[in-house]
């Protein structure tokens, strides 16, 4: 996304975008499993709401903002006003697109660590055990005030760490390995105010094969 630039810079970048056909529209990725495949950890109802409604809204709003950004008559003030919408909705699209991949039905390995993998070894080396790592991730999730995400990321030096982001901010300069949604829409229709139960249950459907692949291909 564009930063705060001079009027001439904004115009130049927009002209390039227009010449290239503006932006490719974002699309809602299909879930790689059935809506009820993550039960009982995540109900069919909540998965339909989360994917079909919330994620779709991020996609729709991102596309709308991108279209407005391509308007050759847009002034600098209009450009700046659109940045927040692009950051928020683009972040929601990016974060959720990863989230669906990092989950898997139990019959397809969800919740089962790849104990022979390099990620598992790195986690146990740093946190002592997978259980201790999960406790720290859950503590990070619980510490989020309002809405946000907790992440296991790998930095450029290869080290793992846990971090959080607010709202739909994305991970930059590091690679996200596991991301867990702490927004109320991710759990409230099923768990209501018992979000600690959601934080515990979601580990039963974490796609460790995907996490291992992301770590190995960092």
Swiss-Prot record:
Family, as annotated: Belongs to the iron/manganese superoxide dismutase family.
Up-regulation conditions: By high osmolarity and heat.
Designated name of the protein: Superoxide dismutase [Mn], mitochondrial
Essential cofactor(s): Mn(2+)
Role noted for this protein: Destroys superoxide anion radicals which are normally produced within the cells and which are toxic to biological systems.
Gene that encodes the chain: sod2
Alphabetic keyword roster: Antioxidant, Manganese, Metal-binding, Mitochondrion, Oxidoreductase, Phosphoprotein, Transit peptide
Modified-residue entries (Phosphoserine), positions: 129
């Amino acid at each position: 996304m564009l930063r705060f630039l001079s009027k001439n810079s904004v115009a130049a970048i927009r002209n390039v975008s227009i010449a290239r056909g503006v932006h490719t529209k974002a699309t809602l990725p299909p879930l790689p499993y059935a809506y009820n495949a993550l039960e009982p950890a995540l109900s069919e109802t909540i998965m339909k709401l989360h994917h079909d409604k919330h994620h779709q809204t991020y996609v729709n709003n991102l596309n709308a903002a991108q279209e407005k950004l391509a308007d050759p008559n847009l002034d600098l003030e209009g450009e700046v006003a659109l940045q927040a919408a692009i950051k928020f909705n683009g972040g929601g699209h990016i974060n959720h697109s990863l989230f669906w991949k990092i989950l898997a039905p139990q019959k397809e390995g969800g919740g089962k660590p790849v104990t022979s993998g390099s990620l598992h070894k790195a986690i146990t080396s740093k946190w002592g055990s997978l259980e201790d790592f999960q406790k720290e991730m859950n503590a990070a999730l619980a510490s989020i005030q309002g809405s946000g995400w907790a992440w296991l990321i790998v930095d450029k030096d290869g080290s793992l760490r846990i971090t959080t982001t607010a709202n739909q901010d994305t991970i930059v300069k590091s690679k996200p390995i596991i991301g867990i949604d702490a927004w109320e829409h991710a759990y409230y229709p099923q768990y209501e105010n018992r979000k600690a139960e959601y934080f515990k249950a979601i580990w039963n459907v974490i796609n460790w094969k995907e996490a291992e692949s992301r770590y190995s291909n960092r």
